[in-house]
Each structure stands twice: as structure tokens, then as C-alpha cells.
């Protein structure tokens, strides 16, 4: 009997060892830990549908029925060309490699007092995000959706963060939905003042940011700054639905202390939920190279000429 039990124990130990090895070999690069193919549901949907013909909850984010695996802990992806699919990240994600693709992923972050995004691609190159969701598990004044550089974002949804997208050079946001951002009365990053919510913020000394056919709707966010805030050269804002903010689009040269060039805002439809009657605010040394085809969404009538002041 003792000998039989020794065989059983040895067999169980061998099976456990084999499972551990298989899990390690099959674990994608950048993972700290993950549950064994446990399905997980995307975070609950909030907000309202996008306007007809524009992205909304039904056309962005993780498709219904997608099997998702939970990944816990902060992750760094340093392997060129890696494809990451069907993950729910409970932790902050950083990309340092070239050509990493995230497909059908959910970014939830973790509790933190540090200012950081759910996904940071600033140190990578040619990152692609497709059909993904950004929604913090622990909303705070510190958490943005994505800090992006050399990144293409398609059919993705951002909600519950302070800013949706902080965009650096060569960032494209297309067919995506940014809405219901989180406002806080006290933001250490704003000197203790309230949060300064932007759907997309494009930074000074950056260039080539493109926003194409998105819904960026801050009409349900308390006291937002702008749907689009930009100090980046060669900005393109094309064929979007835009709403909310003090002014809906705010183009500002002042962080540069030089003229801001190549701003193109064309073919957009504007809501009427800005604090001021101000679809576009243009600072005095900002050049609006093109502004054709911008209309009020409810009437189809052309919007007024940009307000211009610093």
C-alpha cells in the first residue's frame, strides 16, 4: 500500500510540474501573472449611444461574447511585434517595443496616487490599439486613459478617466468613443484645483496628431475644459462629432511662445453643450489652415467663425 501511494504522489507531482512548465512556456512576454483562461466580462457600459453615423458604445470597445483573460499587476511589453489579444489588465501597462498590437483588450489600472495612464505607449513605436476599452477600476484625479506616441487607435472606448487621450507625435485616433470622463474637485496635478478634463489633449512641441471620425462627447462631464485641446503643430480634426467644454475645440499656441501652424479642423459636427457659445477657440498666434465643412449637429448650419484670443 505504501508503495502504491508513493506512485500516486509521484504522478501528481509530475502532473503539477508539467502544468507549471506549460503555463510558463505559453505565457506571453510582459506578463507578471494571469488567471488560467478564465473568461471575464468587460466593465459595465455607461453613457449614451453616439449620434447616428458616429461611433458609440455599440461600435467601439470589445465585441460582445469575446473571451477575456484577467492579467494582474503592472505589465511592460518589450518584445517587438507582439500581439496581445483578449486581456483584461488590472494594473498599468507600458510599451517599450516596436510594433506591439493590443486587440480586444480592457485596461482597468489599479489604485494609485501617481499621475499615470492605463496604457503608456510614449516609449514604444508603431503601437496599434484595436477594439479596446479604457475604464479605470479605481477612478482618481491621477489616471488618464492613454499617453500615446507613434500610436494608432481604432474603434476603442474611453470613459471614467480624467483625460481620454494625451497625444504626442504621430498619434491617430479613429472611429473611437470618448465620453463620461471623471471630474474631481481637488487635483494635485492642477495645484489642488479641480481636474482639467479633455477628451484629447495634444501637447506642445509635438506634431502630426490626427483625430478622424470619432465621437468625443464631454456633454455629461462636469465642467470639462475641451473635447479637443491642442498645442501640437499639424493637427487634423476631421469628420468627428464633438461636444462639451468651455470651448469645444481649443487651439493654443501659448505653451510654445511661437506661432502654432498647420491646424486643420474640417467636416466636423458640433453639439451645443459648451459653457460658452464657442465651437472653436483659436489663440492669436495659431494658424487655422483649413476649417471647411464644420456645422452644428442639430441644424446642419455652419458654425460661427472661431473666437480668437489668448
Features from the language model and the residues they span:
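Secretory targeting and sorting signals
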Residues: 2-25
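C-terminal region of N-terminal signal peptides and the immediate post-cleavage residues
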Residues: 17-41
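Acidic, glycine- and Ser/Thr-rich low-complexity intrinsically disordered tracts
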Residues: 38-70, 258, 262, 266, ...
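N-terminal non-globular leader segments, chiefly Sec-dependent signal peptides
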Residues: 42-56, 122-127, 137-140, 221, ...
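N-terminal segments that cap or nucleate solenoid repeat domains
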Residues: 45-108
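Beta-strand/loop edge motif enriched in small/polar residues
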Residues: 60-62, 70-72, 203, 211-217
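Extracellular beta-strand/beta-solenoid scaffold signature
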Residues: 69-72, 89-91, 109-121, 136-145, ...
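Right-handed parallel beta-helix
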Residues: 81-88, 99-109, 124-136, 148-162, ...
Amino acid at each position: 500500500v505504501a508503495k502504491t501511494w508513493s506512485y500516486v504522489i509521484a504522478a501528481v507531482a509530475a502532473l503539477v510540474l508539467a502544468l507549471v512548465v506549460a503555463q510558463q512556456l505559453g505565457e506571453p512576454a510582459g506578463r507578471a501573472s494571469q488567471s488560467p483562461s478564465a473568461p471575464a466580462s468587460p466593465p459595465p457600459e455607461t453613457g449614451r449611444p453616439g449620434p447616428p453615423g458616429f461611433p458609440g458604445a455599440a461600435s467601439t470597445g470589445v465585441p460582445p461574447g469575446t473571451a477575456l483573460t484577467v492579467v494582474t499587476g503592472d505589465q511592460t511589453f518589450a518584445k517587438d511585434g507582439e500581439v496581445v489579444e483578449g486581456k483584461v489588465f488590472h494594473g498599468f501597462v507600458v510599451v517599450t517595443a516596436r510594433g506591439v498590437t493590443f486587440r480586444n483588450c480592457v485596461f482597468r489600472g489599479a489604485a494609485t496616487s501617481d499621475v499615470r495612464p492605463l496604457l503608456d505607449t510614449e516609449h514604444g513605436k508603431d503601437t496599434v490599439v484595436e477594439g479596446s476599452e479604457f475604464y479605470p477600476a479605481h477612478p482618481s484625479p491621477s489616471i488618464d486613459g492613454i499617453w500615446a506616441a507613434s500610436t494608432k487607435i481604432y474603434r476603442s472606448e474611453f470613459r471614467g478617466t480624467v483625460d481620454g487621450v494625451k497625444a504626442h507625435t504621430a498619434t491617430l485616433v479613429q472611429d473611437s468613443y470618448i465620453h463620461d470622463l471623471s471630474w474631481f474637485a481637488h487635483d494635485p496635478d492642477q495645484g489642488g484645483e479641480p481636474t482639467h478634463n479633455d477628451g484629447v489633449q495634444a501637447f506642445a512641441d509635438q506634431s502630426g496628431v490626427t483625430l478622424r471620425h470619432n465621437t468625443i462627447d464631454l456633454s455629461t462631464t462636469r465642467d470639462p475644459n475641451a473635447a479637443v485641446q491642442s498645442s501640437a503643430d499639424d493637427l487634423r480634426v476631421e469628420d468627428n462629432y464633438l461636444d462639451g467644454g468651455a470651448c469645444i475645440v481649443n487651439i493654443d499656441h501659448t505653451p510654445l511662445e511661437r506661432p502654432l501652424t498647420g491646424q486643420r479642423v474640417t467636416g466636423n459636427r458640433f453639439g451645443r453643450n459648451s459653457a460658452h457659445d464657442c465651437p472653436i477657440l483659436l489663440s492669436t498666434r495659431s494658424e487655422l489652415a483649413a476649417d471647411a465643412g464644420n456645422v452644428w449637429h442639430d441644424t446642419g448650419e455652419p458654425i460661427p467663425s472661431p473666437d480668437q484670443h489668448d
